[in-house]
Structure formats: C-alpha cells, structure tokens
Swiss-Prot record:
UniProt name for this protein: Autonomous glycyl radical cofactor
Gene Ontology terms for molecular function: formate C-acetyltransferase activity
Glycine radical domain residues: 5-127
Taxonomic placement: Bacteria, Pseudomonadati, Pseudomonadota, Gammaproteobacteria, Enterobacterales
PANTHER family: FORMATE ACETYLTRANSFERASE, FORMATE ACETYLTRANSFERASE 1
Length: 127
C-alpha cells in the first residue's frame, strides 16, 4: 500500500517538511518534494533517510497497475482510392494526415514503400 507522508523530524535538516510516497511492501520512498538533496520522483530505500518521524497525508487516488495486453488501434477514415491518388499526385494532397503506430504523419512525407505498406495494411479484402 502507498501512503503519503510529510517528514516532521529527521537528522537531515533538508528532509524536514518534505513530502514522500511510502511503499511499505518495497520499503521504498518516492520524493514528491524536498528542500535539497533529493530530486522529484527520486526513489530511495527507506533506510537511506535514517531515523525519521512523519505524519500521514491522505491520498485522493490509490495508484494501481493495469495491464491491457498491449493492443492498439489506428483509425484512418479514408477511401483506398484517395490514398492511391495521393501516391500518384502528392501535390493535390499537401495536408493529408494519417495515423501510423500511434502518431500522426503527413502521407506525402512517407517513402513510396511506406505509402504502399500503409495502403496494403489499411485496406484488406477480408479478415
């Protein structure tokens, strides 16, 4: 379980009033903010901070890990004829933008091989 804490007493003066996320299971702390000596998001073993006292800070959201399986879907709403015409006459389609592997790209900036690959993968005869 993750607990938000504010350090109220420590041998290291820079730790006073700093905020951390404490992971009891891993015995680690993630720095939220500190005066000096620790960077934001730095993860340290609990033992590194030495003897400390703290007060718990309520967290609004409990972090969770969720694995979806790594699938994604690119949607291009175009006709095959439009892309084929863009290959033959790129000057007619200077603003044609498509989605490729999660990012947007101008169709005319792709190499001819990449353009053919997009057309082949986007328009199939059957599943």
């Amino acid at each position: 379980m993750i607990t938000g804490i504010q350090i109220t007493k420590a041998n290291n003066e820079a730790l006073l009033n700093s905020f951390w996320l404490l992971d009891d299971e891993k015995a680690e702390l993630r720095c939220v903010c500190a005066k000096a000596g620790y960077a934001e998001d730095q993860i340290v073993p609990a033992s590194e901070l030495g003897q400390i006292e703290y007060r718990e800070i309520p967290l609004e959201v409990q972090p969770t890990v969720r694995v979806e399986g790594g699938q994604h879907l690119n949607v291009n709403v175009l006709r095959r004829e439009t892309l084929e015409d863009a290959v033959k006459h790129p000057e007619k389609y200077p603003q044609l933008t498509i989605r490729v592997s999660g990012y947007a790209v101008r169709f005319n900036s792709l190499t001819p091989e990449q353009q053919r690959d997009v057309i082949t993968r986007t328009f199939t005869e059957s599943l």
